[in-house]
Amino acid sequence: MDQDAFFFERDPEAEGEAPRKQESLSDVIGLLDVVLSYKPTEIGEDRSWLHNIIDNPKENKSSCKSDDNNKDRAISTSTQDHRSSEESGISRRTGESKTETHARILDQQGIHRASRRGTSPNPLPENMGDERNTRIDEDSPNERRHQRSVPTDEDRKMAENSNKREEDQVEGFPEEVRGSTSLSDDGEGRTNNNGRSMETSSTHSTRITDVITNPSPELEEAVLQRKKRRPTTIKRNQTRSERTQNSELHKSTSGDSSNLEDHNTKTSQKIPPSKNEEPAVTQKNNHNHRKTKHTTNNANNNAKCLPTPEHDTTSNEEGTSNTSVDEMAKLLVSLGVMKSQHEFELSRRASHQFAKRMLKSANYKEMTFNLCGMLLSVEKSLGNKVEENRTLLKQIQEEIDSSRDLHKRFSEYQKEQNSLMMANLSTLHIITDRGGKTGDPSDTTRSPSVFTKGKDNKVKKTRFDPSMEALGGQEFKPDLIREDELREDIRNPVLEEHNNEPQASNASRLIPSTEKHTLHSLKLVIENSPLSRVEKKAYIKSLYKCRTNQEVKNVMELFEEDIDSLTN
């Protein structure tokens, strides 16, 4: 917190309370002394110098510019200020020793942080700005008014230790002067002193008690040498890398190598020194850090300078590679593998692609790589063709097996058909040879074996009638005789009445005879009776089923009783 700013904030209250002005000022000064000092043990000390600053801040300037009449007044004010400063000198020295030790500890911490973080491209204003912003609240009020003189012993030490600074810079340490803080920047000082641009020399940080405000010419020369050191080291590293490149590239001529060196030196001047890429270093591995730094610079320069000769060599070899590709395409066309050169250029097969790359390759390494790729692609394509042939052979074998089965079935079916054909031919031969007759083959009269459809003389069926027995026109057996044939064991006594011949044929019935007149006569009697049709059928059935004469007699008695009942 600034004294002037605090006082001007309290100014309207002081104007409103004019009689209590001195009391309010003393209270404000006491508060400032408590806040700004670390250990305010001497509060009851004389503060007349503070009263003089606040009441008439422009007194010193006006006394320097006044006339001879005002000289005594100016001398009196200066002596008062000097006495007050001498009286308060003891308290200031005690506070200064504490703040200086604390500032040096913080300075060492800042150096270690910078070494861990890596050196920045502009370390001086960064350290000054950060530390000034962090250390403003720790100021003591004595440092604003009374500025200390710069110690000369440290100037001599800094001039003597300029070579040590260069060593530190090579080893990766931050660019800071040993035993003191870095120099301040005018731009940041104006922004951070709360508008007091006229008082830039009066710094108010405890760390800047040892700052060199007026640097000697030796220090300036050392700083300039440090700033010019990095591009020279980069150039040395680049020249070394160029030598290694020129030793490795055997194909490049002397004129091309000189042009490449000029081009590389121009590009190296344009390349800014990269500080953030360098690794952070501690004090234990200084020697290793030098080696790693040198190798990283060489690697970066090689990465930046290598592509140009490779591009030139590839551009020179493209013409030769194209001619070789064309010759290969012509050879393939002449052998009959390809139809045209354009087809070889546009082919997407892996072996063709690797062949093109091998013909266009610039180094033996690329050539061997592409040759291996071509061989592997050819092997893979051959393996694929072998697998395809295996699958085709399997399919052909399956088709052959199925065709064999079909041939077997067809041959069996053909045998069956042949046997049937032979049988039919034999029957036809017999029919045509004999003429359809089963008699003697000596008969020459032949009848056709195939008959056309003609009108057949159908015999009309005539129902059995007992009157036809005398006529002899009975062709079919009557139902009664058929039923009796089914029961051969049971003999009807009526039928066997006058038939003593055991082997009488059915044809004997066609002859008119009187042997069986009893059965027929009884049937005729029953049919001519006035009974109903159902009763007639029942009596005829029962009559034919009789086994003995007594049964026939009983049936006829029942028939007579029925007729008597009807007539009566």
Curated annotation (Swiss-Prot):
Polar residues bias: start-end ranges: 179-216, 441-450
Region (Disordered): 1-24, 45-324, 434-455, 493-513
Disulfide bridge map: none
Keyword terms of this UniProt record: Coiled coil, Phosphoprotein, Viral RNA replication
Molecular-function GO terms, alphabetical: RNA binding; RNA-directed RNA polymerase activity
Region (L protein binding): 412-445
Basic and acidic residues composition-biased segments: 7-24, 56-105, 129-144, 151-167, 239-253
UniProt record, GO biological process: DNA-templated transcription; viral genome replication
UniProt biased composition (Low complexity): 295-304
Residue ranges of the region described as N0 binding: 33-41
Coiled-coil annotated spans: 387-416
The organism's place on the tree of life at top rank: Viruses
Interaction with the nucleocapsid (N-RNA): annotated segments: 479-568
Domain notes: The N-terminus consists of a long intrinsically disordered tail. The central part contains the coiled-coil multimerization domain (PMD). Forms a four-stranded coiled coil structure. The C-terminus constitutes the alpha-helical domain that binds to the nucleocapsid (N-RNA complex).
UniProt record similarity statement: Belongs to the respirovirus P protein family.
Function noted in UniProt: Essential cofactor of the RNA polymerase L that plays a central role in the transcription and replication by forming the polymerase complex with RNA polymerase L and recruiting L to the genomic N-RNA template for RNA synthesis. Also plays a central role in the encapsidation of nascent RNA chains by forming the encapsidation complex with the nucleocapsid protein N (N-P complex). Acts as a chaperone for newly synthesized free N protein, so-called N0, allowing encapsidation of nascent RNA chains during replication.
Subunit: Homotetramer. Interacts (via multimerization domain) with polymerase L; this interaction forms the polymerase complex. Interacts (via N-terminus) with N0; this interaction allows P to chaperon N0 before encapsidation and form the N-P complex. Interacts (via C-terminus) with N-RNA template; this interaction positions the polymerase on the template.
Designated name of the protein: Phosphoprotein
UniProt organism field: Human parainfluenza 1 virus (strain CI-14/83) (HPIV-1)
Highest classification ranks of the organism: Viruses, Riboviria, Orthornavirae, Negarnaviricota, Haploviricotina
